[in-house]
């Protein structure tokens, strides 16, 4: 079983026995999610924004308009954290202290890169579209150059 390296920044400390670092578990969460939270900083100001995404192999594609301020900020930041959470259930107990949530989550650390090549852009858009709307890519007309 292939695993991601455990480092100080990704090591689960509380309830560590529930943590999984194998590719199947991590990719399973990423493949089931629809929206990610992307965290980065500009100067001394932290930001976190929701973005749709798609995974292909070891690459995460984030969707954003090239002219958007956010995309320019991400491209200028050498480090980001992409987080995805899946809520599996709410556990109701006889006390609020014993109530909880069952969830799975993944934090991915990396450096964003703009996709400039038109063919790679289309391939990335297909990956993102299939993440959010499986099978829809085959049902719609091709994108135009302007789009």
Residue ranges and their predicted role:
Residues 36, 78-82, 104-111:
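Generic beta-strand structural signal
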Residues 4-61:
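An N-terminal domain-cap segment
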Residues 1-17, 89-147:
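Charged, gly/pro-rich active-site loop segments
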Residues 52-90:
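A short mixed-secondary-structure module that forms the rim of ligand-binding clefts
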Residues 45, 74, 100-104:
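A generic structural micro-feature
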Residues 40-42, 70, 94-97:
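Catalytic micro-motifs at enzyme active sites that drive phosphoryl/nucleotidyl and oxygen chemistry
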Residues 31-32, 75-80, 126-134:
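Short, intrinsically disordered, mixed-charge
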């Amino acid at each position: 079983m292939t695993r991601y390296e455990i480092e100080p920044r990704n090591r689960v400390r509380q309830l560590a026995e529930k943590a999984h670092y194998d590719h199947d578990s991590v990719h399973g969460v990423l493949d089931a999610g629809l929206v990610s939270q992307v965290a980065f900083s500009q100067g001394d100001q932290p930001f976190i924004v929701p973005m749709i995404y798609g995974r292909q192999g070891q690459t995460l594609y984030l969707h954003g308009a090239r002219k958007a301020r956010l995309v320019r900020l991400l491209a200028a930041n050498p480090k980001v954290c992409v987080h995805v959470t899946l809520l599996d259930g709410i556990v109701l107990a006889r006390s609020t202290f014993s109530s909880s949530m069952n969830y799975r989550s993944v934090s991915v650390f990396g450096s964003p890169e703009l996709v400039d090549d038109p063919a790679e852009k289309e391939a990335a858009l297909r990956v993102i579209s299939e993440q959010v709307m499986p099978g829809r890519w085959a049902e719609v007309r091709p994108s135009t150059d302007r789009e």
